[in-house]
Amino acid sequence: MNEFWQHCSALLERELTPQQYVTWIKPLAPVAFDADANTLSIAAPNRFKLDWVKSQFSGRITDLARDFWHSPVDVQFVLDPKAGMRTAPAAPSRPPSAGVRNAAAAVDAAVGAVQAAHSARGGGMPGLGMPTNAAQLTDDAADLDLPSLDANEAAAARRTWRPGAAAQAAGGESDSTYERSKLNPVLTFDNFVTGKANQLARAAAIQVADNPGISYNPLFLYGGVGLGKTHLIHAIGNQLLMDKPGARIRYIHAEQYVSDVVKAYQRKAFDDFKRYYHSLDLLLIDDIQFFSGKSRTQEEFFYAFEALVANKAQVIITSDTYPKEISGIDDRLISRFDSGLTVAIEPPELEMRVAILMRKAQSEGVNLNEDVAFFVAKHLRSNVRELEGALRKILAYSKFHGREITIELTKEALKDLLTVQNRQISVENIQKTVADFYSIKVADMYSKKRPANIARPRQIAMYLAKELTQKSLPEIGELFGGRDHTTVLHAVRKIADERGKDAQLNHELHVLEQTLKG
C-alpha cells in the first residue's frame, strides 16, 4: 500500500502544478488496503479536501491503482478521524504558504519567459510625428498636485541613479519621500501573494525594480479590477526606494494626472508641470484607460513619456484591458505602450485564493480555519478585492455575534453574496460563447470531429469550463458529447500550458473570460 502511494504521489507530482500537488495530493495518506475486496482507503485531512479530491482526482488515482495491482481497485476516500480536532495554523507573513512558495519559486523561470517574450518582440521604437492639436478642456478638476521642484532640483534630477543618493535621503527624509512619491509603503513584494495567475507579471515587476529604465520600458500591466495591478506597481516603487533612496518616484492615478493637466492649462503653468514630470526617475501611472478621449492630457503624457525614456527613466502603466483595445487613445501612444513589455494579470486560481485569505486573516490576527478559507475561495472567484471584502464581512459577523468562525457562520455572513455567486456561468453558455468567438457551430462542441479549427476551440471551452465552473472533469466530459475525463484533463493541461507561452492565446482567453463574467 505504501509502495503504491509513493509511486502514485511521484507520478501526480510530475503531472500537476506545484500548487495543486502541495494543496491536494501531499496531505492525503493511504490508511487501509483490503486485498480480498481489492479496496484501498485514502484519508483526507478535512471535508473540503475530501470532496474536492473525490471530484477531481479519484479517476486518475483509481487508474494508477489498477495499473499498479494489475486488477480493478475500488479506491475510497475517507475523512481522517483526527480531522475534527485540527485547526489551520496561522499563515506566516514570510515565507508564504507552501503552495504559494512553490509558485513563487517558479518566478525565476518566469523571468526567463519574460526575457524571451521581450527579445522576440525586437527593439526600437517607430518614429512619430508631432501630436495633434489639443482639444478644449473643462475646468472641473482638483488642484494641481505637484510637489515643489526648483530649477536646480530639476537639473539634478535629470541624471540616472547616483551612488550617493542613499546618504542624502536617510533618517527623517523617509516620511516626506513617501509623501512626495504617493507610494503606499504597505504594498510590497513580500506581501504580494503569487500564483499562476500573476507570476509572470511579478517576475517582470522584479526585473524592472532591479534594472529600472533598462529591462522593459515601458512595463504595461493589464487585467480586471482587484487583481493586484496597483499592488505590484507600488511594490516596484517601494523596492526602488529601498535600493535608491534618492530616486524621484511618483505614483499617480490617471484621473489625477488629467486634473493636473487641466489645472496647469488654466494657470498657464505648463513649464512647472513639464519640469516636474520630465525629471522623474520612475513614473507609475494607474488605470490609463481614463485618458480616453482627453487629447490634451494624451499630448502632455506623450511629451513626458518621450523625455523619461530618453533619460533612461522607467515608466510603468496599468490598464483594465489590452493596450490596443483601449478606445479613445491616440495610436502614437498605443505604439509607445507596445514598444515595451505587456503582461496580463489573470483572476487567481483556487489555491492562490486560499493563500490570499489565509494571509489576510493572519494580518488581522485571526487564525482562519482551512475549511473556511477553502469554502470562501471555492465560491468567490473573480478578484482579490472581493475576497478581502468577504473576509471582512465574516470577521465582523463573527465579532458582532460572538461566535467562532465556521463554515455555517460563513454561509450566514455571506448569504447575499453567495446568492449572487450561485447564478453561475454554465458550461452551455461557455460552449455557445466560444463557438461564436471562433465561428464554429455549438454542435461541434459535442461532435467527434477533429479538424484543428474545431478541436482547438473545443479544448478552450473545456479549459474555461474547468476554470469558471464547479463541474468535475467527468461532468464536463459528459457535457462535451460524453467524452472521458482524461480527454478533458488533457485539454485543460494543454491550454493552461500554452497560455503561458502564447500571448495571442492568452489574450483570446482573457477576452472570453471577461465576456462570460459580464
Curated annotation (Swiss-Prot):
Residues 72-181 are annotated as: Domain II. The keyword Isomerase does not apply. Domain I is involved in oligomerization and binding regulators, domain II is flexibile and of varying length in different bacteria, domain III forms the AAA+ region, while domain IV binds dsDNA. Residues 1-72 are annotated as: Domain I, interacts with DnaA modulators. GO terms for molecular function: ATP binding; ATP hydrolysis activity; DNA replication origin binding; lipid binding. GO terms for biological process: DNA replication initiation; regulation of DNA replication. ATP binds at residues 226, 228-230. Oligomerizes as a right-handed, spiral filament on DNA at oriC. Residues 182-398 are annotated as: Domain III, AAA+ region. Plays an essential role in the initiation and regulation of chromosomal replication. ATP-DnaA binds to the origin of replication (oriC) to initiate formation of the DNA replication initiation complex once per cell cycle. Binds the DnaA box (a 9 base pair repeat at the origin) and separates the double-stranded (ds)DNA. Forms a right-handed helical filament on oriC DNA; dsDNA binds to the exterior of the filament while single-stranded (ss)DNA is stabiized in the filament's interior. Belongs to the DnaA family. Residues 399-518 are annotated as: Domain IV, binds dsDNA. One of its GO terms (cellular component) is cytoplasm. InterPro entries: AAA+_ATPase, Chromosome_initiator_DnaA, Chromosome_initiator_DnaA-like, Chromosome_initiator_DnaA_CS, DnaA_C, DnaA_dom, DnaA_N_dom, DnaA_N_sf. Residues 155-178 are annotated as: Disordered. This is Chromosomal replication initiator protein DnaA.
